[in-house]
Design a protein with these regions (language model features):
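Short coil/turn linking the two alpha-helices of tandem helical-hairpin repeats
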Residues: 162-165, 169-171, 213, 239-248, ...
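Glycine-rich, aromatic-lined ligand/substrate-binding cores of catalytic
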Residues: 46, 304-308, 312-439, 498
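Conserved, well-structured interaction surfaces
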Residues: 39, 43-52, 56-66, 86-167, ...
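Membrane-proximal, proline-rich intrinsically disordered regions
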Residues: 21-73, 255, 391-392, 406-408, ...
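Long, intrinsically disordered, low-complexity segments
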Residues: 20-23, 113-116, 197-199, 258, ...
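Extended amphipathic alpha-helical segments enriched in small hydrophobics
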Residues: 156-157, 233-234, 475-516
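Short, surface-exposed recognition loops and adjoining beta-strand edges that mediate ligand/DNA contacts
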Residues: 65-84, 173, 209-228, 244-346, ...
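Bacterial Sec-dependent N-terminal signal peptides
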Residues: 1-31
C-alpha cells in the first residue's frame, strides 16, 4: 500500500510543478485541446495531470513575503497581517497601514478554491480504471484509482474548509459540476450547513485514507492520511464553537440570503462538546502506536529548532512546496537574513508585542497578568553576556557577547523566534546591530521596522559564506500536534474548567519548551475558566507564533477590536531604529495596524459580488 501511495505521489507532485491552469480553460489545457472529458479520462497521462492539479493550492505557510504578486491567500501573509510581524517588502507590506474595502482586499482564496473543487468533482465523476491498450502500456488500476479518489475527496472537503475559515458562510458546491460556461452563482449556505457537510465528508474520507501517519523523510509531500482528516475536522469544530461563528458576532446575525435564510447561528454551547469529541477522536488516533508525538528529547532549544528542520512525528501535515528559497532567491531565507550579511535583505521584523509575550525561563511573563505574576528575572537595565553557539570555520563554538538584559533569561522559544540587537549571526559569527548608523539601520526601501528580525524556522547552515550551504530543504508545516493539544485544552475548558485535561494538555506544550507547569506558578489558575482561557490564548500566541494561526485566532475569539493581549489596532511597536546605539532601546511606534469590526471576516471578492444575483456580502463590507 505504501509503495502504491509513493508511486501516485511521485507522478502527481512532479506534475504539480509543471501544470497550472485557469478556472475556465483548465480542461483544454490539461488535455491538449481534446474536447471530451471521456477522451481525457481514457488517457492515463491526462488523468494523472488532472489529478495532480487538484493539489496545487495546498497552503504553504513558509511564504510570508516575496516579490510582488507571489504571495496569495494560500501562502502566509497572515503573520504580517496581525500583531506578529512587520513586513518590509512585498504584497503584505501595506496591508495593516490602511483601511480596506471589498475592492482592494488581497489574499483571497475564493476563486481558486472553487476552481479546485470543480476539478475535484469532475475527477470523482469521470476518472476510471484504464487498462493497457495497444502501444499505450501505462495503466490505472482499480486499487490505485480508489486511493486517488480518496485523496481528491479529502481535498474537496479541505478547500471548503479553507473557504469557511476565511469567509464563514459559503456556497457549498458538494458534488455539483458547473460547466465551463456557467457562472458560479449559488446562494451561501448557513454556517450550520457548512460544518455539517464538512463533518460528514471528513468523517467518511478518514476511513478511506491511509490509516497510519507518514513521517518518512523521503515523503516530501502533502499527502493526506486519516490523521490529517481528523485534525481538519477537529479544528473545524473548534472554529464552529468559537464566538465568531457561534452567535457572538452581532453584525453577522443580521446577514440573510435573499429568501430570508439567516446565515450565522445563535449561540450553541453544545458545539464545544462536539469540538471536544472531534479532538478526542484525533488524539486517540495520535496516541495509537505513536502516530504523532511532541518532539521532546529534553533539550528545549534544540527540539524547538529541529521541529521545523525535517519531517518528524509532531508534524501532522506538511508540504514540500515551500518558499524558503535559500540565499539566491527572493524569498524567506534572504528576507530573514540581516542586510549586513551577504545577500541578506533583513525585512521581516518581529513586533515588540510578540517579543514581550514570550515568557522568562522561569515560566513567568515580563509583566504581571491576571493569571501569572511578573518574573523577577526581567529587567531592562544594563547589559550582560549572552552565550550562544556559532560557526567558527568547520567547528561550532560557544561565544559570549554583551546584550541588553531585557534579552537574557528568556524561554527557549524566544531565542528560536527573535533575532535581536548585538546577537551574533550563526554562520559568520558577526555581531548584528539595527541602530542608526549600523548596516541594518532604517534606510533604503527594504528593512525591518522594529529592530528585531524573525529567526523562527530559519536553517542555521544557510548562508552565502563559501564554502557553505546556500539552500536547505525543510517542510512547510500545515498542522502540528502542539496546535491540536492547545485546541483540546481550550475546548475542554469551555465545557468544564475543573477538568484536569485543561492543564494537562496546556502543560504538555509548556514542558516541551522547558517551562514549569502553570499551576505550580499560580495555584489559583486551576479550575478558573477565565484565567485558564487567557493562559491558553497566550500559549497559542507563543507556541504558534508566525505560523499563520494568530490572524485567525484573534478573530475567532473576537478579541481583535479590544484593548489587551489580542489588540489588532493602533500601532505595533519596536526599538528606536532612528536613534544611535545609546538610545536604541527606547520603545517606539513602529508601524500602524488598522482593524475594523468588519475585518473579523473577509469580504466576498468584489468582482464576484458584481456578477452575482444570489450572493450576499459579509457584514460591514
Amino acid at each position: 500500500m505504501k509503495k502504491l501511495y509513493k508511486k501516485i505521489l511521485i507522478a502527481a507532485f512532479a506534475l504539480c510543478n509543471i501544470y497550472s491552469c485557469d478556472y475556465l480553460n483548465v480542461s483544454d489545457e490539461l488535455a491538449g485541446n481534446l474536447r471530451s472529458l471521456d477522451e481525457i479520462f481514457d488517457n492515463v497521462s491526462y488523468t494523472r495531470r488532472w489529478y495532480a492539479n487538484i493539489f496545487t493550492s495546498i497552503p504553504d505557510y513558509s511564504g510570508i513575503t516575496a516579490a510582488a504578486g507571489s504571495i496569495t491567500g494560500f501562502k502566509n501573509p497572515w503573520a504580517g497581517m496581525c500583531d506578529e510581524l512587520t513586513v518590509g517588502y512585498g504584497d503584505a507590506k501595506l496591508y495593516n497601514k490602511t483601511d480596506k474595502n471589498a475592492a482592494n482586499m488581497n489574499f483571497h482564496r475564493w476563486g481558486t478554491c472553487y476552481k479546485e473543487i470543480r476539478q475535484a468533482n469532475i475527477f470523482l465523476a469521470h476518472a476510471k480504471p484504464i487498462a493497457a491498450n495497444g502501444t499505450h502500456v501505462d495503466v490505472l488500476t482499480e486499487e490505485e484509482l480508489t486511493e486517488m479518489k480518496a485523496n481528491v475527496r479529502f481535498m474537496r472537503a479541505y478547500y471548503h474548509y479553507l473557504l469557511f475559515e476565511q469567509y464563514g458562510a459559503i456556497p457549498l458546491v458538494k458534488d455539483l459540476i458547473l460547466e465551463r460556461e456557467d457562472n458560479l452563482d449559488l446562494p451561501r449556505n448557513t454556517i450550520d450547513e457548512v460544518i455539517s457537510y464538512l463533518d460528514e465528508e471528513l468523517t467518511a474520507v478518514a476511513k478511506e485514507l491511509p490509516q497510519k501517519a507518514l513521517h518518512d523523510d523521503d515523503q516530501h509531500n502533502a499527502w493526506p492520511t486519516k490523521g490529517v482528516a481528523l485534525a481538519v475536522k477537529a479544528k473545524m469544530w473548534v472554529y464552529a464553537a468559537s464566538k465568531l461563528f457561534n452567535g457572538e458576532y452581532k453584525e453577522a446575525l443580521a446577514v440573510t440570503n435573499l429568501d430570508g435564510t439567516r446565515l450565522f447561528p445563535d449561540k450553541d454551547p453544545n458545539k464545544w462538546n462536539k469540538a471536544v469529541a472531534a479532538l478526542e477522536e484525533f488524539i486517540k488516533f495520535a496516541d495509537e502506536e505513536g502516530n504523532y508525538e511532541l518532539l521532546n528529547t529534553g533539550n528545549p532549544s534544540q527540539d524547538i529548532y529541529d521541529l521545523f528542520q525535517t519531517y518528524n512525528k509532531e508534524i501532522i501535515w506538511a508540504t514540500a512546496a515551500t518558499s524558503w528559497g535559500g540565499m539566491t532567491n527572493d524569498m524567506f531565507d534572504r528576507r530573514c537574513t540581516p542586510r549586513s550579511e551577504q545577500n541578506g535583505m533583513g525585512c521581516i521584523g518581529v513586533t515588540q508585542e510578540l517579543v514581550d509575550d514570550f515568557y522568562m525561563k522561569d515560566g513567568l511573563p515580563i509583566q504581571a497578568t491576571s493569571y501569572l505574576p511578573q518574573s523577577t528575572l526581567y529587567t531592562t537595565e544594563g547589559f550582560d553576556k549572552y552565550t550562544e553557539t556559532v560557526k567558527a570555520g568547520s567547528k561550532e563554538v560557544q561565544v559570549a557577547n554583551n546584550v541588553s538584559n531585557r534579552f537574557l533569561n528568556r524561554e527557549a522559544r524566544f531565542y528560536n523566534t527573535v533575532f535581536f540587537q548585538n546577537r551574533r549571526w550563526h554562520v559568520t559569527n558577526n555581531v548584528t546591530q539595527f541602530h542608526k548608523g549600523s548596516p541594518n539601520e532604517l534606510s533604503g526601501t527594504i528593512y525591518t521596522h522594529t529592530g528585531y528580525m524573525l529567526y523562527k524556522r530559519f536553517n542555521r547552515e544557510v548562508s552565502m559564506k563559501s564554502p557553505g550551504v546556500q539552500n536547505k530543504f525543510r517542510p512547510s508545516i500545515i498542522f502540528r500536534l502542539a496546535d491540536l493539544y492547545l485546541l483540546y485544552a481550550e475546548a475542554v475548558n469551555e465545557i468544564d474548567p475543573q477538568d484536569e485535561r485543561v492543564l494537562t494538555y496546556l502543560n504538555k506544550v509548556r514542558q516541551r519548551a522547558g517551562l514549569s507547569n502553570i499551576e505550580e506558578l499560580n495555584p489559583a489558575i486551576e479550575g478558573n475558566q477565565e484565567l485558564q482561557r487567557l493562559a491558553i490564548q497566550r500559549e497559542r500566541r507563543i507556541e504558534l507564533a508566525t505560523e499563520g494561526q494568530r490572524y485567525f485566532d484573534v478573530r475567532r475569539w473576537m478579541i481583535a477590536d479590544q484593548d489587551g493581549e489580542g489588540r489588532q489596532f493602533g500601532y505595533v511597536h519596536g526599538m528606536n531604529m532612528n536613534a544611535a546605539e545609546d538610545k536604541f532601546y527606547e520603545e517606539v511606534e513602529a508601524s500602524p495596524i488598522v482593524f475594523r469590526r468588519k475585518m473579523y471576516l473577509y469580504p466576498i471578492p468584489d468582482d464576484e459580488m458584481k456578477k452575482t444575483e444570489l450572493l450576499v456580502q459579509n457584514p460591514g463590507w
